[in-house]
C-alpha cells in the first residue's frame, strides 16, 4: 500500500509539473519554480563573476555586448509578436567576456551571458558569435536549467 501511495504522489507531482517550452511546444517537467531557479542562478552568477577574470580585450568586449544586445532585442521582439512577452519578465540581459582560453560560452537563467575569450579566436565576425550567443539565449528562454534541475531531482528520488 505504501508503494502505491508513493507512486500516486509521484504521478500527481509529475502531472502538475508538466509544461511546454515556449515557441517549440516541446513538453518538459519543471519541479522547481522559475523564481527559485532565478534566485539561485543569480547568486551563482554573481559569485562566478567575482572570481572570473574579466577580459581586458576592449574590442572583444564590445563585440560580445553588441552581438548580445542584438540577439536579446530580436528575442524580445519575436516573443512579443507571438504573445509570449511574459516569458522574459525575469530577464535582465548582461553580457560579459572573461579571460579564459576555453572555446565556450554559457547563459544563466535571467539572461546572464558569459563568453570565454577562447571562443573569439574562432569567431571572426559578429555573425559567427551570434550563432553561439543565440544558442545560449535559447537555453535560457526554454528554461533548460530548470528542466535539468527537475530531472536531477527525479533521479535523486528514484522516480
Where does each model-flagged region fall?
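A Zn2+-metalloprotease active-site environment signal
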Residues: 4-6, 13, 18-159
Amino acid at each position: 500500500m505504501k508503494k502505491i501511495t508513493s507512486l500516486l504522489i509521484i504521478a500527481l507531482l509529475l502531472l502538475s509539473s508538466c509544461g511546454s517550452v515556449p515557441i517549440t511546444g516541446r513538453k518538459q517537467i519543471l519541479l522547481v519554480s522559475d523564481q527559485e531557479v532565478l534566485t539561485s542562478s543569480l547568486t551563482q552568477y554573481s559569485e562566478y563573476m567575482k572570481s572570473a577574470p574579466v577580459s581586458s580585450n576592449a574590442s572583444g568586449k564590445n563585440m560580445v555586448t553588441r552581438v548580445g544586445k542584438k540577439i536579446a532585442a530580436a528575442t524580445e521582439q519575436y516573443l512579443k509578436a507571438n504573445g509570449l512577452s511574459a516569458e522574459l519578465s525575469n530577464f535582465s540581459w548582461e553580457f560579459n567576456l572573461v579571460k579564459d582560453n576555453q572555446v565556450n560560452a554559457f547563459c544563466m537563467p535571467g539572461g546572464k551571458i558569459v563568453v570565454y575569450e577562447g571562443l573569439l579566436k574562432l569567431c571572426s565576425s559578429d555573425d559567427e558569435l551570434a550563432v553561439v550567443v543565440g544558442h545560449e539565449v535559447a537555453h535560457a528562454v526554454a528554461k533548460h536549467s530548470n528542466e535539468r534541475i527537475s530531472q536531477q531531482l527525479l533521479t535523486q528520488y528514484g522516480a
